[in-house]
Amino acid sequence: MEILAALEPSPFPVISLYLSLTSNEVGRGEHQIFVRKVFNERAKGMAAESPERESFDKDVARIQDYLEKNNAAEGQAVAIFACTGSDLFEAIPLEAPIGEHSLFISSVPHLYPLAKLVENYPRYAAVMLDTNKARIFVFGTSTEHEETIVGEKTRRTSQGGWSQARYQRRADNFHMHHIKEVIETLEKIVRAEGLEHVVVSGAEVAMPIFREQLPKYLADKIVEIDAHEDGESGSFVQRTMAALRKKDAETDIEKVQELMDAWRSGGLGVAGPEATLSAFQLGQVEELIITASPESLKPVQKMPDDAARGDLQVVTSNTSGQADESRVKLSDELVTRAHQTAARVRFIEDASLLADIGGVGALLRFRI
């Protein structure tokens, strides 16, 4: 995303297209209908045979070709950024869901929806665990890789007494060895990948051993979910993502309180769109804290002189009304500046938590 954020504004139209690839109630995707409709409408507003129209038409053809060839591709969504005039074409398959189709046309890529997905669905490890087998996945906005660990299965005999006790000790030893191996592998993955979250779905008999053997630093990253009979990773990843989203929402209040305390004490915090934009210009922002609903942002009187020039066109499949383009542009300007300056981004789902400060604020690296 940092590469897209670093692109200079283009004199040609830059297309940012976000599509849900999930099927409707009759098993058919609706994204192609949306694409044809919005592209035809946008083309009518451009002068025929102009350089801008030529670039746009080539982008549309390339996007449609990509969608036709990747119609059966895995994933719940896709984000596509295209501008032939600026030699840009980037298609990003996404495992995370998108609520609605949306098209943005501007002088730069529109990154707010992608940044929101990345923050809401961070890269994390997920574990399916029982006493003799484990599957460890690394998920992000797409499924990245999987590792399977198989322990030795124990077979129960019909003998009782001393033989039964020996069997149980032997089984317990195998279970302990297997789970220790799982934890060792998980530790290596978490350290190598720099992961902050681990979601575990474990058999009832395995989880007490797993919890007991976890080192504290790893235990602090664990989110547990109930065990289900997930045959494939598809339903499993959806359940793990939902668990992370719930956990994230629970900590939103704490993050907003941290911001408010820093701001009110005159410390390392600013509140409101204008103050946050000014802090970005001075290189102060450590973490952007912004509403997950752009329509709840307070508009600014004037965008910074170095903001992306030109208008922003927005079309979505949302039937409840079109977005306020000035607020959408402001939200993207803030998020893009965060990625340009290596600032973290935190989206707050409950818009009311940031309502008193215009929907956005920032924790700072330093004061001036």
Predicted regions and their residues:
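Terminal alpha-helical anchor/extension segments at protein ends
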Residues: M1-I368
